[in-house]
């Protein structure tokens, strides 16, 4: 049996789906993940710019990190979701959406051991 719009979570993804579909690029879970990646990346770069931290990120790393946001796609969203629900690349399931974004970024750092702890440093989920 196919469940139609009457079984949608809300009228927005049910009977109004044809009208709201263009918004998914900006208002979906994938869009939220992409935005969180941007916040975390720019915050990490700002931390690296502070003399008070030992964190260093060369220009190539900064560019690569910004590309994670700029070139974010469905595969990236799937990896973040997998980190959250099942675990990925040696990480156990986080069961936490923002922690999954943190781990996703750690996977893309050239020196995860020394740079990784600075991802999300001093932040709460509300900040991101």
Annotate each PLM feature:
Residues 1-128:
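A helix-coil-helix interface module used to build multimeric assemblies
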């Amino acid at each position: 049996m196919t469940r139609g719009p009457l079984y949608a979570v809300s009228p927005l993804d049910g009977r109004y789906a044809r009208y709201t579909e263009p918004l998914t690029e900006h208002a979906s879970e994938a869009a939220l993940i992409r935005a969180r990646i941007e916040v975390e990346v720019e915050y990490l770069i700002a931390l690296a710019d502070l003399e008070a931290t030992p964190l260093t990120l060369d220009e190539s790393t900064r560019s690569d990190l910004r590309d994670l946001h700029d070139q974010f796609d469905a595969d990236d969203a799937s990896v973040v979701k997998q980190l959250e629900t099942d675990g990925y690349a040696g990480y156990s399931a986080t069961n936490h959406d923002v922690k999954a974004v943190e781990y996703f970024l750690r996977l893309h750092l050239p020196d995860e051991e020394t740079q990784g702890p600075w991802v999300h440093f001093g932040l709460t989920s509300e900040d991101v």
